[in-house]
């Protein structure tokens, strides 16, 4: 079926950071070719110009990212966008130190309704809330993708006259959003309340090219410097949270093709937890590591090249990154999982 879209199969598509951009497009009914074209045009336009005022401003002009995302998604809100399936985006609200997940589900607690319904709320705090359905979709996605250092904080009016300050959802424990989205699907408070079970819920997690943040010898000698320690620690924490999400999803569920978590626990195949599997889980990714790429994809890339591929603002290697993703998909994706 040439007209088949991922929104025809998935009932909820969500993401963090660049994943939120992709998820929004897929949930609106765009096909993968459209999203590939978006990244080919968006990346060179956004990641250009370098620093404005180093250490006082973000590296790139956030207005460019805002303009590209708005042009892609249109001037729609979470409530009136022409959705084809469920959508979720994750972001970090830094002024309150909280992790937010925003969905297009009208049964979500803060979706709320018309002004009369809001005015009738017995909770005074709820009467001040700007309903989730009024949030501009492009603003939500921009907030989820606003990587610190690269882009500015994104303000979103969450209470009347009081904007919240948001940045990249990767700054939460949901850098890999698989576990959080599994909760969104089943925990009644989020509004979906789908049943759990390996034959009831299938969760597909797609990475964007992971890499274990090993420190080269020259950097290890500088790990005593406070700034170096801080950056190394944050980078490692992001990787650790992603791996932990994979570990929990595989341990609590059934995984047809499990990933190795680490050398100690392996894939967790056969690990017991005392109750039936909560879901079927499948992870797809293309680790940007020399040994894996050679072993799995027969690609020989030097460490210097891999260091460049891992950079968020690398716009010169889009073709190579797409090639890696396509090769990984050919080897990993089994159509039987999708019925």
Which stretches of residues belong to each language-model region?
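Patatin-like phospholipase
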Residues: 1-72, 104-119
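Hydrophobic, mid-to-C-terminal alpha-helical segments
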Residues: 185-222
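C-terminal helical/tail subdomains of lipid-metabolizing enzymes
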Residues: 171-174, 193-194, 198, 208, ...
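Extended charged low-complexity segments that act as oligomerization/scaffolding linkers
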Residues: 11, 54-61, 122-126, 130, ...
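Active-site gating loop/helix substructures
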Residues: 48, 84-187
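Catalytic-loop motifs flanking and including active-site residues across diverse enzymes
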Residues: 18, 22, 65, 137, ...
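Extended hydrophobic secondary-structure segments that form protein cores and membrane-embedded regions
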Residues: 8-17, 86-92, 165-167, 198-213, ...
């Amino acid at each position: 079926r040439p007209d088949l879209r991922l929104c025809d199969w998935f009932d909820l598509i969500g993401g963090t950071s660049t994943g939120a951009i992709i998820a929004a497009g897929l949930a609106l009914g765009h096909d993968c070719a459209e999203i590939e074209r978006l990244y080919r045009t968006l990346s060179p336009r956004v990641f250009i110009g370098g620093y404005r005022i180093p250490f006082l401003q973000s590296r790139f002009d956030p207005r460019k990212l805002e303009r590209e995302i708005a042009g892609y998604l249109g001037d729609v809100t979470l409530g009136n966008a022409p959705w084809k399936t469920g959508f979720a985006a994750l972001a970090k609200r830094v002024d309150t130190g909280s992790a937010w997940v925003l969905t297009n589900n009208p049964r979500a607690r803060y979706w709320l309704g018309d002004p009369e319904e809001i005015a009738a709320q017995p909770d005074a705090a709820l009467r001040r809330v700007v309903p989730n359905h009024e949030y501009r979709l492009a603003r939500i996605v921009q907030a989820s993708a606003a990587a610190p250092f690269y882009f500015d904080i994104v303000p979103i009016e969450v209470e009347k006259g009081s904007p919240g300050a948001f940045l990249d959802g990767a700054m939460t424990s949901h850098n890999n959003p698989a576990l959080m989205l599994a909760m969104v699907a089943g925990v009644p408070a989020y509004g979906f309340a789908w049943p759990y079970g390996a034959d009831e819920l299938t969760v597909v997690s797609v990475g964007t090219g992971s890499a274990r943040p090993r420190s080269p010898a020259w950097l290890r000698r500088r790990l005593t410097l406070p700034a170096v320690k801080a950056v190394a620690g944050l980078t490692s924490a992001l990787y650790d949270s992603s791996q932990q999400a994979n570990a929990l999803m595989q341990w609590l569920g059934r995984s047809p093709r499990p990933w190795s978590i680490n050398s100690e626990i392996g894939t967790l195949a056969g690990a017991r937890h005392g109750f039936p599997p909560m879901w079927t889980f499948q992870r797809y990714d293309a680790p940007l590591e020399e040994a894996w790429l050679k072993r799995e994809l027969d690609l020989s890339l030097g460490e210097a090249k891999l260091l460049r591929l891992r950079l968020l603002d690398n716009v010169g290697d889009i073709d190579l990154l797409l090639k890696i993703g396509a090769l990984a998909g050919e080897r990993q994706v089994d159509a039987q999982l999708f019925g």
